[in-house]
Structure formats: C-alpha cells, structure tokens
Amino acid sequence: MTCIIRASSSSPSFFPSKLPSFHSKPAPNPPLFDLRLLMSIVADPSPRGTDDRRLAARCHAVPGLSADEVIAASDEAFGRHSSPSLKRSGSGVAIMWFRNDLRLMDNEALVRAWAASESVLPVYCVDPRNFGATHYFGFPKTGALRAQFLIECLEDLKKNLMKRGLNLLVRFGKPEDILPSIARVFSAHTVYAQKETCSEELLVEKLVLKGLQQVVLPQGGTSNQKSVGPKLVLVWGSSMYHIDDIPFSTKNLPDVYTQFRKAVESKCSIRGCFKLPVSLGPPPNTGLDQIDGWGTIPTLEQLGLKESKHEQGIHFLGGENAALGRISEYFWKKDLLRVYKETRNGMMGPDYSTKFSPWLASGSLSPRYIYEEVRRYEKQRVANDSTYWVLFELIWRDYFKFISMKHGNSIFHLGGPRNVVSKWSQDRSLFESWRDGRTGYPLIDANMKELSTTGFMSNRGRQIVCSFLVRDMGIDWRMGAEWFETCLLDYDPASNYGNWTYGAGVGNDPREDRYFSIPKQAKTYDPEGDYVAYWLPELRQLPKERRNFPGQSYIKQIVPLKFGNTHQSTHASNGRSENTHHSHVRKGRRQNKM
C-alpha cells in the first residue's frame, strides 16, 4: 500500500508573507532553523531497503477498514446517538465556531447553537498564526503531516454537516476579525464555541469577545432601545470528566496525578453524550451572497506544501467518520480492547494500541463516546484490566488539561510549573542529530525517523527519546517539545508540554524525575531488533541480537549514556500508553478499578 505524506513546497503560499504571531508567552530567542528547510525534514523519508522481506516496507492505514465499512460504522454510531424528538425553540441565527472540536457527535456547543436558533451557521477559521513558527526556536507550528490531517478532518466535517442540512463556512484569517464581520452580516445573536485551556487559545477567545462587543445588531422597537451585540458562549467539551463535576477548583487541583484520579473515580460521574438532532438545518437564507459564499477548505499547495509518497509506517485518515470506524475496528471487529493493557507498550504496527489520539487532539472524537463504548464492550464482551486502562489513559488526558489551567504559561517555561533552575544546552548540532535520527543509538534513531515520516510515535518511543534528549544529551527540553509540536498528528498543547515538563523533571509533580536506560529499553521492548531494522534498513543484515547494539557497523554514538550501558530503569515497565492522547512520559500504577 502506498501512503501520502507532505513536504514543504516552493509554491506560492496561501498566507501573507509575514505571519502574525501570538504574544502571550515570554519573548522568544531568535529562530534557530529555517522554516522551509524544517518543513522538508518533517516529511522527507530517507530511502528504504528491501533486503529482508519480513521487514520490507509496508504502510498500514488506520483505520484499516474499507470506505464502505467506515461509513457503516459511522452511520451505526450516529443512529444510536441521534434523537428525532429533539425540538428547537430559538429564533434568529446562531454561529457555531468550530475549533478543536471537529465533530458532530457529542458536541454540546453545536446542539446548543441549534436549539437556540432558527438557523445555524457553522464556521471554521484557518488562523494563519497556527501555521507560523514556534515560540522559542522557530520550528513550524503545524507540520505538513498534521496540516493534511486537518484538511481531511475539515472535509469530513463539511460532508457530515451537509448530510444533516448544513454546510461549513471556511475563511482564512484571524477569528477575531472574521467572526464579528460574519455576525454583523447575518445579524447573529450568539457565537457558540468550545472552551480551550492554553494561553494562545485563551487570547483568541478574549479577542473574539472584544470584536463581538463592537458589533451593533439592528433592534426593533423604540429608537432609544439599548443596542445589543452578539454574545460569545463558550462551552466545555474536550474532556471525559466535565470541569464542573471534578471535586476541586482548578486552583486547588492536586499536583500528583494519583490523587486526582482517585478523587474523580470515587466522587464523580461521567456525563452522557449529547444526542444529535436528525437534521441541523436549515442554514441562513440570506447573507451568503454578501460574503462570497461558503468558501473552500485550503489545499496543501495553498498552505505552501506539496505531497509525496511513502510506503512505511502508519497512515491516519482524518475526520469523525474515520475515528468512529477506528473504534468499531479496534473494539468490535478485531476485539483488541480485551488485550490492550498487554500490548500497549508495543512499537510496531497499527494495533498494539488504540491509536485514538490524533482524532482526540483534533476533536474529531469525543472522549465521552470512547467511555460509553468501553462500558458497552464491558457489558457485551468482557470487563478486565485492559478495558479499565483505556479509561485510565483518558483520565490522564483530562488531568493535563486541568493542569494547564492551574499553571498557565509556566508549562511552557524552562523551569516549568515549579520554576526548577537547571543548566540546559541549546547545541544546534546535537539537537539536529536527535531530530534527524543520527545519534548512533538505533532505538532513538528509529523512533525519530518514524516521527518525521508518519507524524506518530509509540508512547514507549516518546518516553525513550525524551529521556535521551534531556538526560543523556542535556538539551533544552523545550526544543524537543517544540519539535513534537511540529511533527505530531496528535499534538495538543496541554498534554505535549505537560508531558515534556514531566520528562525534564520540571513538571508539577516533584516526584516525576526519571531516567530511561536505552540498553534496557531495547532489550525489553525490541529484543530481536525488528523495530530498529524496520526503520534503519542498514541494520537488517545484522544478527538480531546486534541490531540494537551494532557497534562499528553503525554510525558513531554522538554522546555517551549518562549511566553507561548497565543502568536499569526502575520505571521501565510502568510507562503509559499514547492510545488516547499525545503522550510520551506519562505513567502510573493502576490503583483501583473503576
């Protein structure tokens, strides 16, 4: 199977020559790297050998269903979560501003917009700031692979809206400019959107509110009636546990995950998914002619990118339908949920973990829907440690969102939430060796090549490459975090930066300070060297026991290991999985079953 990936292009860009940027973080250092050069690195796989047929390149689609099977799974899920009895009682026009919630199912903001209006106008703003440079080191904020995944999510969202009587209005520009303008044209009384938690997203919310306050809507009645502008209603909808239901204020959130988990498991219940009306239409009947119609979803070329082909690793299909198809495939067709806890630390293939994280990050998949499907599976098939562990991972995902609210911008700072003072290197040459998979340690190099080729890496791999960068190389952890921001399909600021602070020993939990031994990890999780040989074809001809320890048969090791080759990581067997969110250094022993 041939998969499509994207690399940078010299074609004319969809964006202005000077991209606007956010200013809510401390002043950055000058960019270390050229933006276009890095975009090409993100998605330019090196040539692959084909010597060993068993390790020959193969691309796995996720979900691995046919198009008809995906649609059937999606239709079945929507059928169970739609209600013909829902009634709307509102008037006028409401705008539904889609952000990181690119789905119809269990989208409270969308249902509330529908109920409070006679017609809903769905809007997505292609914000150029999200395609600029990262704050400290000037990497691309959105790499080519995630840009393509986003395009697919938007295309799928548009199709699903059209099936239910609506469409998707797509505009390029800042939401604080676009939404007030559209609200004025359509006389929209309210803009509904999902609430976010991190600084850049919160800044946009403030700017949108300020812009809407400048809009004067036409009023009936007497001439001295007070003018009213459109309201902004932000709805919580990104976590499994609702923020209003957790037994702490964000200010008093525990800094130890286990304390948080035990409290929510014992004191909180998870709300049910919001039912969806059978029809969401009609759209507004006037105003579209004044704004040149619905607009179009940008192509990769318009984003300054082009596509190329690769035949290795995993290829994710974006969109809500694909997400629902993946749940159907993993839980019900392949029956893999029952063994998830035993397989979650794998590194090869599509099915060692759920692979839900890219859809969760884009909001194409509701965590509450996953919860409901786990409970349904437990009733119909089996309830065991594996079914619990998927929920355990979703609680971690929730925790990082709430932690980002408690600690704010400190999760992006060098010293982290605890303001830990440490000496870090920003050696460009060393970092590039890690980034490009040229460290001389096959397990590190293979993982980094998988990341740049596919936009994905196993949780085990994320733990290992993070530990190596910050512990063995002594490199500023923010360089690693920003490179992950560039590459990952499942990038989410709260989880990404929360986890990197943990890995660097500067996170909110003072007990989180661990080292992962590369030899130990290789022997435990890639004992026959299949993973490294898959991504590093020059190792395929070596005996299996030498693939992770090739000596002079491989490139020179760029740094010595901090604890040599005999150190055993006492935490190696307890790493958490990436299955439900973009993790890399998350961990915790299961304490009690839900």
Tell where the protein language model's regions lie, with residue ranges.
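Contiguous, well-ordered alpha-helical segments that form the cores/surfaces of helical PPI scaffolds
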Residues: 123-127, 354-358, 369, 389, ...
